[in-house]
Amino acid sequence: MTVPAPSQLDLRQEVHDAARRARVAARRLASLPTTVKDRALHAAADELLAHRDQILAANAEDLNAAREADTPAAMLDRLSLNPQRVDGIAAGLRQVAGLRDPVGEVLRGYTLPNGLQLRQQRVPLGVVGMIYEGRPNVTVDAFGLTLKSGNAALLRGSSSAAKSNEALVAVLRTALVGLELPADAVQLLSAADRATVTHLIQARGLVDVVIPRGGAGLIEAVVRDAQVPTIETGVGNCHVYVHQAADLDVAERILLNSKTRRPSVCNAAETLLVDAAIAETALPRLLAALQHAGVTVHLDPDEADLRREYLSLDIAVAVVDGVDAAIAHINEYGTGHTEAIVTTNLDAAQRFTEQIDAAAVMVNASTAFTDGEQFGFGAEIGISTQKLHARGPMGLPELTSTKWIAWGAGHTRPA
């Protein structure tokens, strides 16, 4: 057995100590009234606005370091904060305060023939670990959603956003202390050492679930090495399939919106599939529209292209021989995120929705709609691409588990 170096032992102890503090905080949060949680969210929003200059100064340090490291423009944009973005982050907390509290919701209840009353109701998960890349807004989003759902958050952000995250979490903790709530409801783990991630995802018995949010490499590493339950989020090799019965005006609008609205997010389209029956007329038009929008088109894509999540103004293009071939292609190369078909044929649409294995399937609609707010249930902590415990946009209910409660009157079970 390899004995860890003292520094690693210290780091593991640091993570475990933080998790234990989070468990203590989570026990209190689990029984907080909704009004108190909402008051805390509004207080946190107020603190963010009051300390906006401090937050922006910290973010400027991160941005300067990122520029010196030749960080790509798309990543700089995700890292960047400005007054408007801070205002938006604060507004997001107020929005969460306005959402329905899932804790205590009764999912089902009934009385047994013997008079024993049973009910199943939602309860918090407990301690939620979040591992994410250089997006400071995720720090506050995670805090808001975990607090409202009665959970404590252990956050491990990217080293590229370390200063920003430290400033944000300090402000959030100040808001909690001001209301005599446990500051350890939100804690930021060190991003200076990658081993922090390992210790977090292996803290079985201390951490109830870990949610990785980032690129494919991050998510695969977490799922591979974790000893605590994980919820996979994010990786989106999304397809737009233009069926032979498609309205090409509609197809062009959906394709451009799916690809170009925000190319760096996980619900952006990465592959265009065109039905062979209309390829001769549809392809030139769709390719011209993409190129006019500044999209680099990858014709004759190889295996790597077909599996790539570009997260940029790039798209792979392939021709398929009918709806069954499109379904087979997507189920082979897709990541189970969001898939779209454009067609006026109801049978083809029905076949597509039934046989595509994905968290969301769109019929004559953009892949960009896979989003908690767009789905009508508010903010999300990520988009799950797995089937257990949650699938699709993860809002407040997905940050809960359930418990059964039985009310009796001296009931005993017969031998």
Curated annotation (Swiss-Prot):
Question: Which compartments does it reside in?
Answer: Cytoplasm
Extract the InterPro entries matched here.
Answer: Ald_DH/histidinol_DH, Ald_DH_C, Ald_DH_N, Aldehyde_DH_dom, G-glutamylP_reductase_CS, Glu-5-SA_DH, GPR_dom
One GO biological-process annotation of the entry reads: L-proline biosynthetic process
Could you say which enzyme class this protein belongs to?
Answer: oxidoreductase
PANTHER family given in the database record: DELTA-1-PYRROLINE-5-CARBOXYLATE SYNTHASE, GLUTAMATE SEMIALDEHYDE DEHYDROGENASE
- Role played: Catalyzes the NADPH-dependent reduction of L-glutamate 5-phosphate into L-glutamate 5-semialdehyde and phosphate. The product spontaneously undergoes cyclization to form 1-pyrroline-5-carboxylate.
| Name of the protein | Gamma-glutamyl phosphate reductase
